[in-house]
Each structure stands twice: as structure tokens, then as C-alpha cells.
Amino acid sequence: NRLVERAAKYGIKRYLYLNEPRAMGEEYFDGSPQRMSYAGSKLGDLYSFCSSNPEVLAWLSRSMEGLFSKVDGLGGVFTITASENHTSCASRNYRDCSLCSKREYSDLIADVNRAIELGVHRASPDAKVIVWDWGWPDDKCEKIINQLPKECWFMTVSEWMQRIERGGVPVSLWEYSMSVEAPSARAKRNWEYARRAGLKTVAKVQVNATWEMAIVPSIPVLDLVARHATNLLEQDVDGVMLSWSLGGYPSENLKLFQSFDGKMSADEAVEKLAREEYGEKAGALVREARRECSKGFEAYPFHIFVIYNGPHHIGPSNLFYMTPTNYKATMVGI
């Protein structure tokens, strides 16, 4: 409650990221026939909570209702229902569940989101329930979206599945990128599905930094940021989520993106900001530098192993060897 109140002083609402119902270890279910009836598919030593069991969905709704009843002023939630964490049976190995294996995958994902929406809005009708399609199989998106409550907002990452070729290497993006043209055909398609289903739409973006270069507070590629903003205006999305696990620094990137209203071209907007921030003489030089940075960044050698395992996040602390070691780099952030 204190965090909600502090944020409210500045006109900010707090949202919760929900990755529920979270799987539990065997010890949670052992010795309790009732709890064991909630268990679904198994991954390692974790059992999912089976969303084909009505009691699990009712518990999920009650939990959301209780949370939003006790924390007045929460802005809402956004959900991940098919992530790398084991949650419902549909998040992993649902074919191993005796109940879920008989049902459509799209029904299972929609059920969890419906249960969350029901509980949130019973306690707080004005709170937003944003449903993110992270991890949904591409051929299931339309069916899931069509089953979501009309009160939900649908969110997808703007650049996902954008196809590019850098240095002769073809890549289909499954990560955030500031070096590519966005939104992708997949994002446009899923937003259109959502509009047809009567849902509001959200673009999930990172305009400050990505794993392409996470060591800096922001990447000075403002031409690319402005171009992305222009493209999203053309898509007429209802909202944006501006950062995620990195990229929250209050930079000129964020200032440019948030203020972009389409009344001037991308080039004009970047130039105007440079002159406002640095004056006429220095602003012209800054503008040219940003143009060159943006141009160069479009040649970034984007590949998932580069951005996750490359040495560029570590900088001078990265060790050098005179001979090959055959060591495999640890994933960034671990």
C-alpha cells in the first residue's frame, strides 16, 4: 500500500507482473489428497496447478480479488501464461496431464487469463488486465485472443518474429531489438486479431536499451527510436510498455518516444530534441552524431547467442586468452 501511495503522488500507477498459478514442489502436494487433486503435469520436481480443475481457477480468481481488495489503487496486472516458468499445465507438458491432454491448448491459456481478469475486476473494476502473448505458439494466437474477456488489453512485443539478414546470416527475432524495423508482421496480425475481438492493444517495446548493448543506460540511436514511434502511431495501438528487465534510465530516448505525436517527421523530431537539449550550434553536431549511430546500429550482428553470450556486456572485465580455451560464455545477467 505504501508503494502504491508513493507512486500516486507523481501520477503513477503500479502494475503487477503475474506468472501464475506458479508450480510447486512435491512436498507441497505430498500427504494431502485435496492438494494432490490440484496437481497436473510435472517438470523436474515441480507440479503445475491444473487449470482444468475448476477449484484451481476459482482459487486463482479469489487470490486476485483478495489482493486488489487489500491494495487499493493498484493500476492492474499483466500476465505471462506460457513462460519458461512452470505454471499451469499449458505452460509445459500439458499432454502429460490426464485432464488437460483432452482439451485444446488455446482453451487452457484463455481459462487462466479469464480467471485472473474475473478476480481483479470483482475487486477493482477500473484496473487494467493486460494479457501478454509471450510463449504462445504462433498458430494458437488467434484462438486464444478470441476467447479473452472484452475487458482485457492484449499486449505483444512489437518486433517479434521480424525476419532480418545481417552479414549473410538470416535471423527471425525472438528478443527485443532496437536495430530492426518494427513492428513485425506477427505483431500487426495479433493486434488486428485483438481489435476484431473487441480488445484494446498494447505494444511491448524497449527504446532505451536491449541485450544488444545492455551495459549502457541508453543506446543513442534516436532515429531508430523515432522511426519505431512513427510506425506504432500508424498501427494506432492503445498503449505501450516502454521497458522491461533493463532500459529504465530516464534518457532522451524515453523523452523522444513518449512525446512523439506524429505532428512532425521522425527526422524533424530527433533534430528538434537535439537543439532543445544542446542549443543551435552543438545541437547540429549532436544530431549528426545520432544519425551516424543509428545508421551503424542497423548493421548490428543480431543473433541470440551474440546478445546472450557475447562479451560486449562485460566490457574491460572480459578475460582475454592467447590460445583457444573452448570455454562457453555464461548467459548475460547470470
What spans do the regions from the language model cover?
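Glycine-rich tight-turn/loop motif centered on a GG-T
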Residues: 1, 42-51, 91-106, 171-181
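Aromatic- and acidic-residue-enriched segments that line the glycan-binding/catalytic groove
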Residues: 1, 22-44, 88-100, 145-153, ...
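Aromatic- and glycine-enriched glycan-recognition loops and surfaces
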Residues: 1-10, 26-31, 42, 52-59, ...
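An active-site-proximal structural segment forming one wall of the substrate-binding cleft
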Residues: 2-16, 48-81, 111-119, 232-235, ...
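Active-site-adjacent "subsite" loops/lids of carbohydrate-active enzymes
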Residues: 15-66, 200-202, 222-230
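Short, solvent-exposed turn/loop segments enriched in Gly/Ser/Thr/Pro and often Arg
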Residues: 18-23, 80-84, 135, 243-246
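Active-site groove signature of glycoside hydrolases
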Residues: 20, 45, 60-102, 297, ...
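Substrate-binding groove of N-acetylhexosamine-processing glycoside hydrolases
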Residues: 69, 102-334
